[in-house]
Curated annotation (Swiss-Prot):
Residues 449-470 have a biased composition (Basic and acidic residues). Its main location: cytoplasm. Belongs to the FKBP-type PPIase family. Tig subfamily. This is Trigger factor. Residues 432-493 are annotated as: Disordered. HAMAP family: Trigger_factor_Tig. NCBIfam families: tig. It comes from Frankia alni (strain DSM 45986 / CECT 9034 / ACN14a). It holds the Pfam family Trigger_C. Residues 162-243 form the PPIase FKBP-type domain. The gene is tig. It is found in: Cytoplasm. GO terms for molecular function: peptidyl-prolyl cis-trans isomerase activity; protein folding chaperone; ribosome binding. The lineage of its organism: Bacteria, Bacillati, Actinomycetota, Actinomycetes, Frankiales.
Protein backbone atom coordinates (compact mmCIF):
# COMPACT_ATOMS: atom_id res chain seq x y z
CA UNK A 1 0.00 0.00 0.00
CA UNK A 2 1.18 3.50 -0.82
CA UNK A 3 -0.25 6.60 0.85
CA UNK A 4 0.40 10.26 0.11
CA UNK A 5 -0.85 13.30 1.99
CA UNK A 6 -1.95 16.63 0.52
CA UNK A 7 -2.60 19.59 2.82
CA UNK A 8 -5.81 21.32 1.75
CA UNK A 9 -5.88 23.84 4.60
CA UNK A 10 -4.37 24.18 8.08
CA UNK A 11 -7.20 21.97 9.36
CA UNK A 12 -7.86 19.56 6.49
CA UNK A 13 -5.83 17.03 4.52
CA UNK A 14 -6.45 14.67 1.64
CA UNK A 15 -4.99 11.17 1.66
CA UNK A 16 -4.54 9.30 -1.60
CA UNK A 17 -4.14 5.57 -1.03
CA UNK A 18 -3.02 3.03 -3.65
CA UNK A 19 -3.55 -0.65 -2.81
CA UNK A 20 -2.29 -3.50 -5.05
CA UNK A 21 -4.95 -6.12 -5.75
CA UNK A 22 -2.93 -8.81 -3.93
CA UNK A 23 -3.29 -6.86 -0.66
CA UNK A 24 -7.07 -7.10 -0.97
CA UNK A 25 -6.97 -10.91 -1.01
CA UNK A 26 -7.52 -11.34 2.78
CA UNK A 27 -10.65 -9.18 2.61
CA UNK A 28 -11.82 -10.93 -0.55
CA UNK A 29 -11.35 -14.37 1.06
CA UNK A 30 -13.20 -13.21 4.18
CA UNK A 31 -16.07 -11.91 2.04
CA UNK A 32 -16.37 -15.24 0.22
CA UNK A 33 -16.44 -17.10 3.56
CA UNK A 34 -19.13 -14.80 4.92
CA UNK A 35 -21.29 -15.08 1.82
CA UNK A 36 -20.85 -18.85 1.74
CA UNK A 37 -22.49 -18.97 5.19
CA UNK A 38 -25.29 -16.59 4.22
CA UNK A 39 -26.23 -17.73 0.72
CA UNK A 40 -28.32 -20.89 0.30
CA UNK A 41 -27.65 -22.80 -2.91
CA UNK A 42 -29.30 -26.12 -3.66
CA UNK A 43 -26.78 -28.96 -3.41
CA UNK A 44 -24.39 -27.14 -1.08
CA UNK A 45 -24.33 -27.05 2.70
CA UNK A 46 -24.20 -23.61 4.42
CA UNK A 47 -20.63 -22.38 4.42
CA UNK A 48 -19.58 -24.74 1.63
CA UNK A 49 -20.66 -22.76 -1.42
CA UNK A 50 -17.57 -22.41 -3.69
CA UNK A 51 -16.42 -18.93 -4.77
CA UNK A 52 -17.11 -19.66 -8.46
CA UNK A 53 -20.76 -20.45 -7.64
CA UNK A 54 -21.05 -17.24 -5.62
CA UNK A 55 -19.56 -15.33 -8.55
CA UNK A 56 -22.21 -16.84 -10.83
CA UNK A 57 -25.14 -16.19 -8.49
CA UNK A 58 -24.21 -12.78 -7.07
CA UNK A 59 -21.83 -11.37 -9.61
CA UNK A 60 -18.09 -10.96 -9.24
CA UNK A 61 -18.39 -7.16 -9.18
CA UNK A 62 -20.80 -7.18 -6.27
CA UNK A 63 -18.51 -9.45 -4.27
CA UNK A 64 -15.47 -7.33 -5.05
CA UNK A 65 -17.36 -4.25 -3.94
CA UNK A 66 -18.26 -5.80 -0.59
CA UNK A 67 -14.65 -6.91 -0.11
CA UNK A 68 -13.48 -3.35 -0.70
CA UNK A 69 -16.00 -2.01 1.80
CA UNK A 70 -14.68 -4.54 4.32
CA UNK A 71 -11.09 -3.49 3.67
CA UNK A 72 -11.51 0.29 3.63
CA UNK A 73 -11.54 0.97 7.41
CA UNK A 74 -8.27 -0.90 7.99
CA UNK A 75 -6.63 0.53 4.88
CA UNK A 76 -7.63 4.04 5.90
CA UNK A 77 -6.34 3.50 9.44
CA UNK A 78 -2.99 2.26 8.13
CA UNK A 79 -2.70 5.29 5.84
CA UNK A 80 -3.46 7.63 8.74
CA UNK A 81 -0.75 6.00 10.83
CA UNK A 82 1.76 5.97 7.99
CA UNK A 83 1.28 9.68 7.28
CA UNK A 84 0.97 10.58 11.00
CA UNK A 85 -2.34 12.33 10.51
CA UNK A 86 -3.98 13.60 13.72
CA UNK A 87 -7.60 13.20 12.65
CA UNK A 88 -10.50 15.09 14.19
CA UNK A 89 -13.45 13.97 12.09
CA UNK A 90 -14.83 11.10 10.10
CA UNK A 91 -13.33 10.97 6.60
CA UNK A 92 -15.02 11.64 3.29
CA UNK A 93 -13.94 8.66 1.19
CA UNK A 94 -14.07 8.44 -2.59
CA UNK A 95 -13.03 5.37 -4.60
CA UNK A 96 -11.38 6.77 -7.71
CA UNK A 97 -10.04 3.59 -9.33
CA UNK A 98 -10.80 -0.11 -8.99
CA UNK A 99 -11.17 -3.06 -11.33
CA UNK A 100 -10.96 -6.82 -10.95
CA UNK A 101 -7.27 -7.69 -10.74
CA UNK A 102 -6.21 -4.05 -10.70
CA UNK A 103 -5.17 -1.74 -7.92
CA UNK A 104 -7.59 0.05 -5.63
CA UNK A 105 -7.16 3.82 -5.41
CA UNK A 106 -9.21 5.89 -2.99
CA UNK A 107 -8.99 9.32 -1.44
CA UNK A 108 -9.99 10.37 2.06
CA UNK A 109 -10.47 13.98 3.11
CA UNK A 110 -10.48 14.55 6.86
CA UNK A 111 -10.26 17.39 9.38
CA UNK A 112 -7.02 17.41 11.35
CA UNK A 113 -5.58 19.11 14.39
CA UNK A 114 -3.95 22.40 13.38
CA UNK A 115 -0.35 23.08 14.27
CA UNK A 116 -0.06 25.50 17.19
CA UNK A 117 2.93 27.81 17.54
CA UNK A 118 3.23 28.36 21.28
CA UNK A 119 4.80 31.56 22.63
CA UNK A 120 7.63 31.46 25.13
CA UNK A 121 6.02 30.73 28.46
CA UNK A 122 8.19 33.31 30.23
CA UNK A 123 6.81 36.00 27.90
CA UNK A 124 3.29 35.47 29.19
CA UNK A 125 1.98 37.99 31.72
CA UNK A 126 -1.34 38.62 33.42
CA UNK A 127 -2.65 41.22 35.84
CA UNK A 128 -4.89 40.12 38.68
CA UNK A 129 -6.60 41.80 41.61
CA UNK A 130 -4.54 42.04 44.78
CA UNK A 131 -5.60 39.97 47.78
CA UNK A 132 -7.13 42.62 49.99
CA UNK A 133 -9.54 42.07 52.85
CA UNK A 134 -10.99 45.19 54.48
CA UNK A 135 -12.29 45.57 58.02
CA UNK A 136 -15.74 46.19 56.54
CA UNK A 137 -15.67 42.82 54.77
CA UNK A 138 -14.69 41.07 57.99
CA UNK A 139 -17.51 42.77 59.89
CA UNK A 140 -19.94 41.86 57.12
CA UNK A 141 -19.04 38.19 57.56
CA UNK A 142 -19.40 38.47 61.33
CA UNK A 143 -22.78 40.10 60.78
CA UNK A 144 -23.88 37.19 58.62
CA UNK A 145 -22.73 34.79 61.35
CA UNK A 146 -24.69 36.75 63.97
CA UNK A 147 -27.72 36.58 61.70
CA UNK A 148 -27.49 32.77 61.68
CA UNK A 149 -27.64 32.74 65.49
CA UNK A 150 -30.43 35.29 65.75
CA UNK A 151 -33.56 34.51 67.76
CA UNK A 152 -37.07 35.38 66.55
CA UNK A 153 -39.03 37.30 69.17
CA UNK A 154 -42.76 38.17 68.94
CA UNK A 155 -43.49 41.91 68.78
CA UNK A 156 -46.69 43.93 69.09
CA UNK A 157 -46.29 46.50 66.36
CA UNK A 158 -46.85 47.00 62.64
CA UNK A 159 -44.91 44.93 60.11
CA UNK A 160 -41.47 46.24 59.12
CA UNK A 161 -39.00 45.12 56.47
CA UNK A 162 -36.86 42.33 57.89
CA UNK A 163 -39.62 40.95 60.12
CA UNK A 164 -40.81 37.36 59.93
CA UNK A 165 -44.57 37.08 59.63
CA UNK A 166 -47.15 34.33 59.52
CA UNK A 167 -49.54 34.87 56.61
CA UNK A 168 -52.85 33.57 55.33
CA UNK A 169 -53.12 34.03 51.56
CA UNK A 170 -56.00 33.77 49.10
CA UNK A 171 -56.53 34.97 45.54
CA UNK A 172 -59.39 35.62 43.16
CA UNK A 173 -59.76 36.60 39.52
CA UNK A 174 -62.83 38.20 38.00
CA UNK A 175 -64.45 38.06 41.41
CA UNK A 176 -64.10 34.27 41.70
CA UNK A 177 -61.73 32.43 44.10
CA UNK A 178 -58.82 30.71 42.38
CA UNK A 179 -58.70 27.03 43.26
CA UNK A 180 -55.43 25.99 44.88
CA UNK A 181 -54.34 29.59 45.49
CA UNK A 182 -54.80 29.49 49.24
CA UNK A 183 -52.25 29.12 52.06
CA UNK A 184 -52.54 29.27 55.83
CA UNK A 185 -49.82 29.98 58.38
CA UNK A 186 -47.18 30.65 55.74
CA UNK A 187 -43.87 31.88 57.23
CA UNK A 188 -42.32 34.74 55.26
CA UNK A 189 -39.42 37.17 55.67
CA UNK A 190 -40.66 40.60 54.73
CA UNK A 191 -38.47 42.22 52.10
CA UNK A 192 -37.05 38.98 50.70
CA UNK A 193 -39.20 39.32 47.57
CA UNK A 194 -39.27 35.57 46.99
CA UNK A 195 -43.00 34.90 47.25
CA UNK A 196 -45.42 37.14 45.33
CA UNK A 197 -44.66 40.38 43.52
CA UNK A 198 -46.24 43.26 45.42
CA UNK A 199 -46.58 41.38 48.71
CA UNK A 200 -43.83 43.25 50.55
CA UNK A 201 -45.24 46.66 49.71
CA UNK A 202 -48.74 45.53 50.70
CA UNK A 203 -48.03 44.17 54.18
CA UNK A 204 -45.41 46.66 55.44
CA UNK A 205 -47.26 48.74 58.04
CA UNK A 206 -50.00 46.15 58.60
CA UNK A 207 -50.87 45.14 62.16
CA UNK A 208 -51.34 41.63 63.50
CA UNK A 209 -54.72 40.38 62.26
CA UNK A 210 -54.99 42.99 59.52
CA UNK A 211 -55.67 42.03 55.90
CA UNK A 212 -54.25 43.79 52.85
CA UNK A 213 -55.38 43.25 49.25
CA UNK A 214 -53.22 43.96 46.19
CA UNK A 215 -53.20 43.15 42.48
CA UNK A 216 -50.48 41.03 40.92
CA UNK A 217 -49.84 38.82 37.91
CA UNK A 218 -50.17 35.06 38.37
CA UNK A 219 -46.95 33.28 37.44
CA UNK A 220 -48.10 29.65 37.53
CA UNK A 221 -51.17 27.46 37.21
CA UNK A 222 -53.96 27.43 34.64
CA UNK A 223 -54.40 31.20 34.90
CA UNK A 224 -50.72 32.14 34.62
CA UNK A 225 -50.27 35.59 33.12
CA UNK A 226 -53.63 36.88 34.32
CA UNK A 227 -54.17 39.61 36.90
CA UNK A 228 -55.48 38.49 40.28
CA UNK A 229 -56.43 40.12 43.56
CA UNK A 230 -54.43 38.62 46.43
CA UNK A 231 -55.46 39.05 50.05
CA UNK A 232 -52.76 38.66 52.72
CA UNK A 233 -53.72 38.48 56.39
CA UNK A 234 -51.01 38.93 59.02
CA UNK A 235 -51.26 36.28 61.78
CA UNK A 236 -48.16 37.13 63.79
CA UNK A 237 -45.10 39.37 63.68
CA UNK A 238 -41.61 38.47 64.88
CA UNK A 239 -38.34 40.34 64.66
CA UNK A 240 -34.79 39.01 64.70
CA UNK A 241 -32.85 39.56 67.88
CA UNK A 242 -29.13 39.43 67.14
CA UNK A 243 -26.69 38.12 69.77
CA UNK A 244 -24.14 40.55 71.18
CA UNK A 245 -20.82 40.53 69.33
CA UNK A 246 -18.54 39.48 72.18
CA UNK A 247 -16.41 36.62 73.48
CA UNK A 248 -19.52 34.66 74.52
CA UNK A 249 -20.77 34.82 70.94
CA UNK A 250 -17.37 33.64 69.64
CA UNK A 251 -17.54 30.64 71.99
CA UNK A 252 -21.10 29.81 70.90
CA UNK A 253 -20.62 30.29 67.16
CA UNK A 254 -17.13 28.84 66.70
CA UNK A 255 -14.28 26.87 68.20
CA UNK A 256 -12.62 30.10 69.37
CA UNK A 257 -12.70 31.49 72.91
CA UNK A 258 -12.41 35.17 72.05
CA UNK A 259 -13.93 37.52 69.53
CA UNK A 260 -10.47 38.62 68.40
CA UNK A 261 -9.55 35.03 67.55
CA UNK A 262 -12.81 34.58 65.65
CA UNK A 263 -12.28 37.85 63.80
CA UNK A 264 -8.75 36.75 62.85
CA UNK A 265 -10.06 33.43 61.53
CA UNK A 266 -12.70 35.19 59.46
CA UNK A 267 -10.03 37.43 57.94
CA UNK A 268 -7.81 34.43 57.21
CA UNK A 269 -10.65 32.58 55.48
CA UNK A 270 -11.52 35.62 53.41
CA UNK A 271 -7.89 35.97 52.35
CA UNK A 272 -7.80 32.30 51.35
CA UNK A 273 -10.99 32.77 49.37
CA UNK A 274 -9.49 35.81 47.62
CA UNK A 275 -6.36 33.81 46.77
CA UNK A 276 -8.52 31.09 45.23
CA UNK A 277 -10.41 33.73 43.25
CA UNK A 278 -7.06 35.17 42.21
CA UNK A 279 -6.00 31.84 40.72
CA UNK A 280 -9.28 31.61 38.81
CA UNK A 281 -8.84 35.15 37.53
CA UNK A 282 -5.29 34.41 36.44
CA UNK A 283 -6.44 31.26 34.61
CA UNK A 284 -9.13 33.15 32.76
CA UNK A 285 -6.89 36.07 31.80
CA UNK A 286 -4.06 33.79 30.73
CA UNK A 287 -6.36 31.87 28.41
CA UNK A 288 -7.69 35.14 26.98
CA UNK A 289 -4.12 36.30 26.40
CA UNK A 290 -3.22 33.06 24.65
CA UNK A 291 -6.31 33.26 22.44
CA UNK A 292 -5.27 36.76 21.40
CA UNK A 293 -1.64 35.83 20.73
CA UNK A 294 -1.92 32.39 19.16
CA UNK A 295 -3.58 31.89 15.79
CA UNK A 296 -5.54 28.64 15.97
CA UNK A 297 -7.85 27.80 13.05
CA UNK A 298 -10.91 25.73 13.89
CA UNK A 299 -12.35 23.12 11.50
CA UNK A 300 -15.89 23.97 10.45
CA UNK A 301 -17.14 20.49 11.30
CA UNK A 302 -15.71 20.69 14.80
CA UNK A 303 -17.26 24.10 15.42
CA UNK A 304 -20.63 22.92 14.14
CA UNK A 305 -20.47 19.89 16.42
CA UNK A 306 -19.62 22.00 19.47
CA UNK A 307 -22.45 24.44 18.73
CA UNK A 308 -24.88 21.55 18.30
CA UNK A 309 -23.76 20.01 21.60
CA UNK A 310 -24.24 23.30 23.44
CA UNK A 311 -27.67 23.82 21.90
CA UNK A 312 -28.66 20.29 22.88
CA UNK A 313 -27.60 20.84 26.48
CA UNK A 314 -29.45 24.16 26.61
CA UNK A 315 -32.65 22.59 25.26
CA UNK A 316 -32.40 19.83 27.85
CA UNK A 317 -31.85 22.32 30.69
CA UNK A 318 -34.72 24.56 29.56
CA UNK A 319 -37.00 21.54 29.35
CA UNK A 320 -36.06 20.56 32.89
CA UNK A 321 -37.06 23.96 34.27
CA UNK A 322 -40.23 24.12 32.21
CA UNK A 323 -39.43 26.98 29.88
CA UNK A 324 -38.63 27.48 26.22
CA UNK A 325 -35.92 29.16 24.19
CA UNK A 326 -37.95 32.29 23.43
CA UNK A 327 -38.63 32.93 27.12
CA UNK A 328 -35.00 32.28 27.96
CA UNK A 329 -33.80 34.78 25.35
CA UNK A 330 -36.27 37.32 26.69
CA UNK A 331 -34.79 37.01 30.19
CA UNK A 332 -31.32 37.51 28.69
CA UNK A 333 -32.48 40.52 26.72
CA UNK A 334 -31.02 39.07 23.51
CA UNK A 335 -32.35 38.36 20.05
CA UNK A 336 -31.94 34.90 18.56
CA UNK A 337 -29.26 36.25 16.22
CA UNK A 338 -27.31 37.83 19.10
CA UNK A 339 -27.52 34.66 21.16
CA UNK A 340 -26.44 32.43 18.26
CA UNK A 341 -23.47 34.70 17.59
CA UNK A 342 -22.45 34.52 21.25
CA UNK A 343 -22.73 30.72 21.28
CA UNK A 344 -20.63 30.52 18.14
CA UNK A 345 -17.96 32.78 19.65
CA UNK A 346 -17.75 30.91 22.96
CA UNK A 347 -17.75 27.55 21.19
CA UNK A 348 -14.86 28.66 18.99
CA UNK A 349 -12.91 29.89 22.01
CA UNK A 350 -13.51 26.59 23.78
CA UNK A 351 -12.09 24.58 20.88
CA UNK A 352 -9.13 26.92 20.35
CA UNK A 353 -8.31 26.77 24.07
CA UNK A 354 -8.31 22.98 23.91
CA UNK A 355 -5.92 23.02 20.98
CA UNK A 356 -3.55 25.41 22.77
CA UNK A 357 -3.51 23.45 26.02
CA UNK A 358 -3.12 20.17 24.14
CA UNK A 359 -0.10 21.65 22.37
CA UNK A 360 1.38 22.47 25.79
CA UNK A 361 0.70 18.89 26.91
CA UNK A 362 2.58 17.54 23.90
CA UNK A 363 5.43 20.06 24.13
CA UNK A 364 6.03 19.46 27.83
CA UNK A 365 5.19 15.72 27.86
CA UNK A 366 2.66 16.25 30.63
CA UNK A 367 1.23 13.04 32.05
CA UNK A 368 -1.32 11.93 34.61
CA UNK A 369 -0.79 9.50 37.47
CA UNK A 370 -3.24 7.05 38.98
CA UNK A 371 -3.69 9.13 42.12
CA UNK A 372 -4.80 12.22 40.20
CA UNK A 373 -7.27 10.18 38.20
CA UNK A 374 -8.71 8.42 41.25
CA UNK A 375 -9.20 11.73 43.08
CA UNK A 376 -11.37 12.93 40.22
CA UNK A 377 -13.28 9.65 39.95
CA UNK A 378 -13.99 9.54 43.71
CA UNK A 379 -15.08 13.18 43.83
CA UNK A 380 -17.39 12.93 40.84
CA UNK A 381 -18.78 9.59 42.04
CA UNK A 382 -19.71 11.17 45.38
CA UNK A 383 -21.32 14.08 43.60
CA UNK A 384 -23.33 11.64 41.46
CA UNK A 385 -24.33 9.52 44.46
CA UNK A 386 -22.53 6.44 43.11
CA UNK A 387 -19.84 4.13 44.40
CA UNK A 388 -16.44 4.97 42.84
CA UNK A 389 -16.11 1.55 41.19
CA UNK A 390 -19.58 1.82 39.65
CA UNK A 391 -18.87 5.35 38.42
CA UNK A 392 -15.52 4.24 36.97
CA UNK A 393 -17.23 1.40 35.09
CA UNK A 394 -19.75 3.82 33.63
CA UNK A 395 -16.94 6.11 32.50
CA UNK A 396 -15.07 3.22 30.90
CA UNK A 397 -18.11 2.13 28.87
CA UNK A 398 -18.09 5.34 26.83
CA UNK A 399 -15.63 8.15 26.22
CA UNK A 400 -16.11 9.64 29.69
CA UNK A 401 -12.87 8.30 31.15
CA UNK A 402 -10.72 9.69 28.34
CA UNK A 403 -12.55 13.03 28.56
CA UNK A 404 -11.91 13.10 32.31
CA UNK A 405 -8.22 12.37 31.79
CA UNK A 406 -8.06 15.11 29.16
CA UNK A 407 -9.61 17.54 31.64
CA UNK A 408 -6.95 16.77 34.24
CA UNK A 409 -4.14 17.04 31.69
CA UNK A 410 -5.35 20.40 30.43
CA UNK A 411 -5.62 21.72 33.96
CA UNK A 412 -2.03 20.65 34.60
CA UNK A 413 -0.98 22.37 31.37
CA UNK A 414 -2.69 25.57 32.45
CA UNK A 415 -1.03 25.45 35.87
CA UNK A 416 2.34 24.94 34.17
CA UNK A 417 1.75 28.08 32.12
CA UNK A 418 0.79 30.03 35.24
CA UNK A 419 3.92 28.85 37.05
CA UNK A 420 6.07 30.27 34.25
CA UNK A 421 4.05 33.41 33.49
CA UNK A 422 4.61 36.82 35.05
CA UNK A 423 1.70 37.58 37.36
CA UNK A 424 1.30 41.06 38.87
CA UNK A 425 -1.41 43.03 40.62
CA UNK A 426 -2.90 46.32 39.46
CA UNK A 427 0.06 48.28 40.85
CA UNK A 428 2.63 46.06 39.15
CA UNK A 429 3.64 44.16 42.27
CA UNK A 430 4.61 40.52 41.70
CA UNK A 431 1.94 38.03 42.78
CA UNK A 432 2.68 34.48 43.89
CA UNK A 433 -0.38 32.44 43.04
CA UNK A 434 -1.60 29.80 45.49
CA UNK A 435 -1.51 27.00 42.92
CA UNK A 436 -2.36 23.52 44.20
CA UNK A 437 0.30 20.83 44.05
CA UNK A 438 -2.01 18.78 41.82
CA UNK A 439 -5.28 19.53 40.04
CA UNK A 440 -8.13 19.71 42.51
CA UNK A 441 -11.32 17.83 41.64
CA UNK A 442 -13.26 19.80 39.03
CA UNK A 443 -10.69 22.60 39.12
CA UNK A 444 -11.70 23.59 35.62
CA UNK A 445 -15.40 22.89 35.78
CA UNK A 446 -16.47 26.49 35.33
CA UNK A 447 -13.86 27.33 32.75
CA UNK A 448 -15.83 27.59 29.54
CA UNK A 449 -12.80 28.54 27.46
CA UNK A 450 -11.11 25.28 28.32
CA UNK A 451 -13.87 23.63 26.37
CA UNK A 452 -14.83 21.06 28.96
CA UNK A 453 -18.03 19.24 28.66
CA UNK A 454 -18.62 17.00 31.61
CA UNK A 455 -20.93 14.77 29.67
CA UNK A 456 -17.96 13.32 27.82
CA UNK A 457 -17.97 15.64 24.81
CA UNK A 458 -14.37 16.32 23.83
CA UNK A 459 -12.68 17.46 20.64
CA UNK A 460 -9.19 16.08 20.96
CA UNK A 461 -8.28 13.53 23.58
CA UNK A 462 -4.81 13.62 25.11
CA UNK A 463 -5.25 10.71 27.47
CA UNK A 464 -2.43 8.82 25.80
CA UNK A 465 -4.21 7.16 22.88
CA UNK A 466 -3.12 7.18 19.27
CA UNK A 467 -5.40 9.37 17.18
CA UNK A 468 -4.67 7.30 14.13
CA UNK A 469 -5.99 4.22 15.85
CA UNK A 470 -9.27 5.82 16.93
CA UNK A 471 -12.20 3.61 16.01
CA UNK A 472 -14.36 6.54 14.98
CA UNK A 473 -11.58 7.90 12.81
CA UNK A 474 -10.62 4.55 11.31
CA UNK A 475 -14.04 3.82 9.88
CA UNK A 476 -14.90 5.73 6.70
CA UNK A 477 -18.35 7.25 6.74
CA UNK A 478 -20.63 6.41 3.83
CA UNK A 479 -17.83 5.25 1.54
CA UNK A 480 -19.13 5.37 -2.06
CA UNK A 481 -19.54 1.90 -3.49
CA UNK A 482 -18.09 0.86 -6.83
CA UNK A 483 -21.18 -1.30 -7.40
CA UNK A 484 -24.30 -2.17 -5.43
CA UNK A 485 -23.52 -3.44 -1.93
CA UNK A 486 -24.32 -7.03 -0.99
CA UNK A 487 -26.97 -7.59 1.68
CA UNK A 488 -25.68 -8.93 4.97
CA UNK A 489 -28.69 -11.13 5.68
CA UNK A 490 -29.32 -14.76 4.69
CA UNK A 491 -30.26 -15.21 1.04
CA UNK A 492 -31.97 -17.92 -0.96
CA UNK A 493 -30.87 -18.19 -4.57
Amino acid sequence: MKATKETLSPTRVKLTVEVPFDELKPSLDATYRKLARQVRVSGFRPGKVPPRILDQRLGRGVILDEAVQEALPQLYSEAVQAEEVDVLSRPEVDITEFADGGQLVFTAEVDVRPEVALPEFADLSVTVDAVEVTDEQVEEQLGALRDRFAQLQPVERAVQTGDFVSLDLSAQADGKPIEGAEATGLSYEVGSGNLIEGLDEAIVGAADGESRTFTTELLAGDQAGQQAEVTATVRGVKEKELPALDDDFATTASEFDTLDDLRGDVRSRLEQSRRTEQVGQAREKLLESLLERVDVPVPDSLLAGEIEAREHRLSHELENIGTDRATYLETLGQTAEEFDAEVRETAGKAIRSQFILDAVIDAESIGIDQGELMEQVIYRAQRSGLQPDVYAQQLAQGEGLQALMADVLRTKALFLLLENAKVVDGEGNPVELALPARPAPDADEDDDHAGHDHEGHDHADHAGHDHAGDDAAAEPAEAPAATAAVDSGDRDI
